[in-house]
A protein has these predicted regions:
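Non-catalytic peripheral regions of nucleotide-handling enzymes
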Residues: 1-82
Length: 82
């Protein structure tokens, strides 16, 4: 089961030299993670553009879908998996 978060909260992400997430900090918790999958989404360039790098990550406590908003330069949490 997964939980899609209504608001996509901003999170802190530490990355390796290639830009892969290695640690996620959310709600004061620091979680080392490994990348399972990643993909890029670019849509609606003619109105409110979306340019995101999505990354599915797994940690010791959870599996999550996070993304880097390439327009704003901020990381967000979109979904948590049980």
């Amino acid at each position: 089961m997964s939980r899609l978060l209504r608001e996509h909260p901003a999170i802190e992400v530490e990355t390796d030299p290639t830009g892969q997430p290695t640690v996620i900090v959310w709600n004061g918790r620091r979680e080392p993670v490994e990348v399972c999958n990643r993909w890029r989404v670019e849509e609606a360039w003619w109105r409110d553009p979306i340019a995101r790098d999505y990354v599915k990550v797994v940690g010791q406590r959870w599996l999550a879908l996070v993304y880097l908003d390439r327009i704003e330069g901020t990381w967000h949490l979109e979904r948590l998996y049980d």
